[in-house]
Every structure is written in structure tokens, then in C-alpha cells.
């Protein structure tokens, strides 16, 4: 199509039609399904542009068409791909001058959104939580606009964040929601007579916003070619009481031996040593400045605390010889490996101490201020400048030492935001303006996000693909959310939690808010579960049930040898991780969702498990939803079973109503009622068959229910089977040697118990007869 500036240009695919007027930079996007102009009006910041339509073929998204707009100082594009449910927005900035150009932030356009709902019935979901559009302070990376009642709406998200950090702002404008996407670069350098490509934004309309969020995450995974390893479950030493922090070389073997016997058979496979193992540097009593001034070291101008430099020791090249592991970290890792565990270690790859013996003569390894002093970020400390080739080599060798020489195959990387050279904003959820770009790097052509991503790539290169890498944590500064895409196996998606009710909700809130990233972009880490006897049992069940059902990283951090048997059994019922993708039911109804659903069909039948959570520790509640709203398959009647109460809830029809005492939960397996016997639940795992049943079959000719189950040695395995009226159990057998089988039927419920002296996949058969 020939270039023009005035006439309307149109592109379309099966889902959308885009109309654009180049002369004004105004465009409109319609969803064909309901003939809805969900972007009523979009407006590029460039005007008087020439335009053309081109056909493209993308290596990831395939065939498509783009509207290309070209102005004097920038270009813009709107693209539709045949295979994608999103509209893609891109652009370039042009530097036509003879001097370099610096861009700190870039706001390409604004979008007026309408989803056929009054604005009063709409909420936006972003990193700041569930808000009215006008109350959103700005969301990092993504923002969803949805109907509270109907779930329809739009999802907008930055697909790429390779050089800049994506933010989306919202406001209410009469009967519409106005979105303003923005990229914060900090400092993007465009050389003379050159141009810079900006990040890519995607926007799409969906009947269920959850579908859109999940597909957005799928697009990120496709763009960055993300392939996740198997999700592990494990133990972190930090919160344990006693023996917290890094634990020590006397008590860690005691813990590991106990876990090997009690929880490893159920699926606990890593043990990670946390902070306080490392070489001494910053002394928490008094800082040895070694001839440097506070000003050189970066003391903040407004800081009144005499211990402004307080934070973790930050020399990760060696252990503290007077610390918890005097025999060294190689010995610690070997002791864990010998017992069959993946050894894990905490460190801060981008935060190091310039005053430690290792680095005192290498001040050039650190980011600087404009006046030549060191740039300091509160708590984590001084920032390694990865653009300096010598610092680059130093970090590479440090990671290789930890993984290849010491033998740690699980890394927990704390203080990640130091890699961007920006403020600590903890706890950071909604957008906060920071000092991104003010720190001075060796290579000033690299943006802060670019430096950060290169640092993470270096860690992966040095560690190898067989090392599991967990980032920690986005709440220190949310620049690390999108900046980490494609470079980590897991990410702490919130701040530190704790065993008290207010603190334990931190993981579920952040893990719900960002649920769609889990299992697609990385594994969400909500911080550990707690089982300690000092904690109310119902609160332990509440947190454990949420983590286990949501499928997010399951980590324990109590002194497990002291757990009462009842609480140790809870740990067994949440291991291993099911490895699937659950979703919240009420994502746009409650800031902290109260209902989750997990669905699986791997065993040949569909299994649905619902989690109901009362996060209020002062008030009882009742939650009622229709089967359709819950996401259950269409059926006239359903059978339900309460896992923790170990009892059948009978049959319900169109809706399920659940009563919850304050600060409690219920985990309920649901299946459509059939005209023959079927397995509704098991006692092995909170998912009630999803983790353990590998097959289930009904033979109508032989009146036989058969299947295979993964059984743990010495753990009585119970099948909870619904037996419709007119049937009774006749015989039961196990085809696995040494595995005993027994059963008891009461009315319409059968309990079949299998016992195996070894962990094995057991084949079982139960015959029935008509009564």
C-alpha cells in the first residue's frame, strides 16, 4: 500500500480490526466477536506521519500485518498476527542530530478503554493489587481491566523489557478507562544519526481476563524461548527456630538425616543454606572504613542512622572461618548430596563489599555516582558494575566456584535490584519513581535494565543449565519483575513472610496477583510455609493449602525434627508439587482471592480440586458459587469430599456453599456424579488423586474399577470411592507383590486401603456387583 498521511488505514485478522488515521495519530481497535471497540480511541504521540501497511512473518508469531507510521523523530507500528489474541505495539526513536540523544522515559500513546460496563463496575488488576482505575498508582509490566461481575476485559502488558522497564498507568475519564503505557529507561543513549528500537506492548480483549493474563504469560515464554525445569520442593534454613539463618555444620546434618527419613520419600528434594555463611566483611558492630570516607562510600545525604551501611556480609568468595561452617562450603554441599538432596546456597550476585579483602583494591568494579564516589543501595550495599570486563570476569569466577567447585546446584539470588543500580523500595508493589539511571557505569551505553539482564545471563552461563536459579525478590524494587523474564527458573514474587496471620498473607496476595506467571514464565515463590507448634493449626493449614493447591514453590523453614506428628503429616500431604497451573476463581472480586481451582486430566479422567480460604482471622464467612462460576464441568449433580476433614460432603447440584471459620480453609475434591463407582479423593496428597493416581478406568462389562497409584513406603494409602445406589463392592486386589489391600463400604462410600513396604506404582482392581 502506498504511503499516505490522511486517509484511514485498516488491518484485520479473525479477532480484531484496526482503523488508523495517520494524519492525527488516532486509531481504534474493534473486537469482532461482539463488535466492540474495546480501544475506543488510541492516540500516538507522533502526528503528521506517513503510513503504510506491510505483511510480515515473525519467527515466533508467524504471519501478520502491520500499520507502520513514520514521523520526523519517531516511528510506530500496530501489528496483528493470525495466531495471536493480542495487538502488538512497537516503535523507534530517531536521532537525526549530530549529537547523542538521551531518553529517560518513553510514553508512546494513550488508550481509551471500553468493555461495555460502567466504569463503576470495572476494576484494574496490576502489581499494586485490585483497584479502581483512578486509584492505580501505576503497575509494573502489566495491567488488566475487567468487569467485576462478568470477568470480561482487556489485558495490556509489556512483552519485552530488554533495555527498559515497562509501566502502565490508568485513570478514569468520563465513561472510559484511560491507559498510559510507559517505558522507563533510566538512561537510553541513542548515538548521532541513529535510532533505538523500543520495547513491545501487547493488548487484547478477552471474555475472561484470566485467559488473557495466562496467554500474556505464554507470549512472554514464547518470546524468550523459556523452558522450565521440573519444579522442586525443599527446605530453606532462614526462618527456622531454632537454628535459623544459615543453620550450621552441626545441626544441618541432623536436619537432613531427619528429612531423608521422613519427607524425602514424599518429594522434598533440596535443602538450601541461607544468609550468614559467607566471608565476613561489613561488621554489624562498627564499619571498618579502611581509610574511606562516608561520602565516598555513598552515605545518603538524609540518612540519620549511624549504621546506614548495615546489611548482610557481602563477600561470597569464601565462607566465614569463624561462622557456622568452619569446615567450608564444599563439605556442607557434599553432606547434603550424600543424603540425596540438591544442595542450595543463598548469595547476592550484584551486591558486594568494596571494603572486604577480596575487593579493596578493585574499586573500579563498582557503580559510581556522578561525583566519582561509590553508588550505595540501602541494605544490600554497593553494586557490582557488570559492564566492567574485570568485574564481569570476577562474577563469573565467583559463580563457577560456588557451583562447580563447592557443588551447589540450587542458587537463591538475593538483592537482585542492585544489578539495576537503583533505590531499595521495599515493599514495592505499585509504581514508585526512583533514581534509575543515575548510577554511573563503566559502559554508559548500557541501560540499567540492560546491565541487569546481562548480569543474570552471566550467572546462568557460569552456573550452567543444570543449576536451579531462584531470584529474590521483586518487592525490593519492581524493576526486577519484567527485567528478569527469561533468565530465572523461579522468583520470589513478594516480601518476606512470617508465621503470624498478617505476614503469612504476603505470599498468597502476591502469588494471586501474579499467578499467571507461575509455570509459564517462571515458578512463583511465595516464601515458605510454616508448621511450627507455636502457630495455630488452622493457620498452618490455611497457608500450606494455598501454596500446595496453587502449585507455587513449596518450601519449608521450620526446625522439622521438633514438629508434632500431626504437623509433620501436613508436610507429607503437600509434597511433592503437582507441577500444574491452578487459577483463582474470584480474581476480580477480592484483592486477596478466596477461591482457587486446580484441574487435571492426566489420569484419563478429569479431576477438580477447589480451595476455599478465609483470610480474616476475626470473622467467620460463607462462600457460595455456582458450578459454572467455579469452573466445574457441566453436570446435573456433583459429589464433593473435604480433604482435611476426611469426609464426604454428599451431593450438590447447581451451586456449592462452604462455611469457613475465621482464619481457616477447606480443600474440596469435586467430580460429576456418575452412574457407576469412581474415585473422588485419596489421602496421599492435598490434590486428592492428581499427584498419585496415574490411571483410572471403569470396565462396564466386568463391573470393575481399576487404576494405578503412586504409593509411599509405609504410608497407608486410601482411595475414597463413591458407590452409587444399586452397587456394592465385591472384591479388591493389588497386582503389586507385598502390597496389601482392604476395603470398607458405608452406604454410598467405599474406603479402600493399600499398604506397600516400598515406594511403588501400585495397580489395583475393585469389582462391584448390583444389589
Q: What is each model feature region?
A:
Residues 87, 148-150, 547-550, 555-557, ...:
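Carbohydrate-binding surface patches
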Residues 652-690, 746-771:
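C-terminal beta-strand-rich structural cap/linker in extracellular carbohydrate-active enzymes
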